[in-house]
Structures are given as C-alpha cells and as structure tokens.
Amino acid sequence: MNYKVLGKTGLMVSEIGFGGEWLERHPEDESIELMRYASEKGINIIDCWMPDPKSRDIIGKAMKGNREKWYVQGHFGSTWQNGQYVRTRDMQYVKPAFEDLLTRLQTDYIDIGMIHYVDTVEDWNSLQDSDFLKYVLDMKEKGVIHHIGMSSHDPKVSALAVKSGLIEMLLFSVNPAFDMLPSGQDLGELLEEGFHYDSGLAGINTERADLYKLCEEYNVGITVMKGFAGGRLFDEKRSPFGVALTPMQCIHYALTRPGVASILCGYDTKEQVDEAVAYENASE
C-alpha cells in the first residue's frame, strides 16, 4: 500500500481508503470482518458520514483494540431523526448526533471532524459565526477532533472553503463522469435518474479542474467520494461514455488529480477490497 500526506493534516493516509456507506447492507459480523480485512491490506482511513446506529456500531466494533490503525472522518451535521438521515445545522440535533458518533465508535476522539455536505454558497455563508461552526472549533480546541475538513460536491463552494483557511482537507466527489458535468448539477438527482449529457459537452469542467489545483496550492488534501459514481461507470448501459470502465481506471483517474491523497471506495466483499488494493501493484 502506498501512503500520501493528507494536506495540512499531516496524516499519512492509504491511497485506497474505505467508504463506510455499504456496511449496513450486511450482517454485523460480516461487515466487522470486512473492515478488519481492509485494515490488514493496509487501508487506514474511513469515512463515517452515516448517522444510522448500525453503521456506527459496526465501525466501533471493528476498530476496537486497534483504534490507532484508523483515521476516521466523522461528520458534524449528519443526524438520525425518526429512523431517517437528516442533514442539519440545528444544534439540538447536531451535538447529540456527534456525541453518539463518539459513543458508538467507542472512541474519545475523531481524527478529522467534517463539516457535513456544504453544497451552496448560501449554506457556506450561513456557517460563518454560527453556533454550528463554534461547536466544531470548540471540539478542535478541546482535542476531541484533531483536524477540520468539509464534504462537498460543488467546486465553487469548495473553493471558498479552501481559500478561507478553515479546512485542512476536503471530501469531494471525483470521477471521470462528474468532472465533465456543468457546475450546479444536482449529483444526488443524477445518481437517482442517470446521466444526461449535452452532446456538445467535451472535456473536464474547468471549475472542477481549477479546484484540484487550488487544493494542491493551498495544501488542502482531498479524499475522494463517489469515485465509481455508485457503480454506474461499470455498466455500459448506465455509463455516459457508452462503455464500462473498470475500478482500476476510476481509481487511477481519482488518484492522479492534483491534491488527491486517497479514494474512499465502498466494499461489499473481501474480493472487492482485493480488487481495489490491486491498483497499488498494477503496471501503468
């Protein structure tokens, strides 16, 4: 496994990371074993945006006894309300949800405290001088979180955050298809309904390309989410390119963008872990 410095955090993270979103699909013992298997393969960074109790419990149990082997991205503002995920800045939900994260992960610290899902300039502006941001900064000062990051799908908002000096790293959606989309595209809607490209569109979205360079310039490390576009790029009928890409191609694309330190892949099986980790030994 190769490791890269994650921007200003100084953390040496594995190029192949772990996106925890799919853990709740499977029986708890299988998911715990899968996460431990990934650790044995050298994977040392996991994103836990998920607020549901099952996912958090799995991660906590999998890390028990080897917490120091994992860097955790834990999110402020991802909450579980009435059995549903709700993104919010309301402190009556934010604080208990973060405390729940610590409890279920069986840890007294989170390596990277993530400002969750900031996709509009309005949302970014509203964070300034907010109780939400004060809470994040307070957790940093108290050592409960060691670093501050942010997750976003929008290059304009991300650029504002990078230039602000607030964040040390960015969780951003990077894949060959998303990088050709016009800015402002609703990626959640796109993943639900499929890709619809203007036939005249060609080449990378310059705002996204500029963001990667900006992150490199400001030493804000990038970890990659949605590197496979939810698996759609592996299906020629759902891929906007008309051909199926391979995991290896998507991983290579993400890891060769400026500023990128790690791609956080979702896994259902040990074989999928092996397939992703095999990138490290693949020839150019």
Regions found by a protein language model. Name each.
Residues G19-D29, T79-K95, V121-N125, F234-A244:
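Active-site mouth loops of central-metabolism enzymes
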Residues M1-G74, E141:
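N-terminal binding-site loop/beta-alpha segment at the start of enzyme catalytic domains
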Residues V118-E284:
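Beta/alpha (TIM)-barrel catalytic core signal, keyed to glycine-rich beta->alpha loops juxtaposed to Asp/Glu
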Residues L23-D29, D47-D57, Q81, R89, ...:
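Acidic-and-aromatic substrate-binding clefts and catalytic sites of carbohydrate-active enzymes
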Residues G7-G10, E40, G60-Y71, L102-D108, ...:
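Acidic (Asp/Glu)-rich catalytic clusters
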Residues L6, F18, I46, I59, ...:
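Conserved, mostly hydrophobic/aromatic
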Residues D100-W124:
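Active-site groove signature of glycoside hydrolases
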Residues R25-A38, R89-Q106, S152-L160, L245-Y253:
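Short, acidic/polar
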